[in-house]
């Protein structure tokens, strides 16, 4: 799918181009694109994954920061006049601008490893406009996104992602599928925003703060981490054991803490 125009991957953009056609076909199958859907790809590179999707949907938006790649992308995909290229930084891009009241967007991409976590937080803040997301990420990031309470990788990213979305780790992709080959395994993740939040918080900033405080010293107990925020009476009212470590709490527990602190502060 990807053509052979020369372009050296740029380290500052975190570029690793996917060239394994078998993996590309498998990703497209997981996405399951349909004609007429509004699919947005972040960092299309030379268009390997893009071609597999737009061949079905017949239209597509892509967000690409590397201006030198855009002419290559347009040449590779010249057969698709309904390809819209946005030369922009995905970290600052307003994805809601591509939605309509009738149609949410689907977001896909082989995300640059160096900005994958902040980019996911940026997308989660616009989750109401997104039907689902399929990303290639460093395997450890996917493991963190999908981690459950008690897992060693369960943390701030796990809680906030799962507050907004159902998260599924789909399959692992080895370094040999990329040029240049990264030093670690990658994985495909599916994130599907909840149509109705199962545990809505009254103030999202408070939830973010309580999760950040909770995990700032993950080997310490909740009593220690929330010192000055919650006392023993508060933990009793919440029915949460203050001797637990933060990785034992689920999303609902953190939401209850946030809502409790909002009410307590009046």
Swiss-Prot record:
It is an enzyme of class 2 (transferase). SMART domains: rADc (SM00650). S-adenosyl-L-methionine binds at residues 16, 18, 43, 64, 89, 110. CDD domains: AdoMet_MTases. It catalyses: adenosine(1518)/adenosine(1519) in 16S rRNA + 4 S-adenosyl-L-methionine = N(6)-dimethyladenosine(1518)/N(6)-dimethyladenosine(1519) in 16S rRNA + 4 S-adenosyl-L-homocysteine + 4 H(+). SUPFAM superfamilies: S-adenosyl-L-methionine-dependent methyltransferases. Its main location: cytoplasm. Pfam families: RrnaAD. Gene3D superfamilies: Ribosomal RNA adenine dimethylase-like, domain 2, Vaccinia Virus protein VP39. GO terms for cellular component: cytosol. It is found in: Cytoplasm. InterPro entries: KsgA/Erm, rRNA_Ade_diMease-like_C, rRNA_Ade_Mease_Trfase_CS, rRNA_Ade_methylase_Trfase_N, rRNA_adenine_dimethylase, SAM-dependent_MTases_sf. Its EC number is 2.1.1.182. GO terms for molecular function: 16S rRNA (adenine(1518)-N(6)/adenine(1519)-N(6))-dimethyltransferase activity; RNA binding. Keywords: Cytoplasm, Methyltransferase, RNA-binding, rRNA processing, S-adenosyl-L-methionine, Transferase. Belongs to the class I-like SAM-binding methyltransferase superfamily. rRNA adenine N(6)-methyltransferase family. RsmA subfamily. PANTHER family: DIMETHYLADENOSINE TRANSFERASE (PTHR11727), DIMETHYLADENOSINE TRANSFERASE-RELATED (PTHR11727:SF7). Specifically dimethylates two adjacent adenosines (A1518 and A1519) in the loop of a conserved hairpin near the 3'-end of 16S rRNA in the 30S particle. May play a critical role in biogenesis of 30S subunits. This is Ribosomal RNA small subunit methyltransferase A.
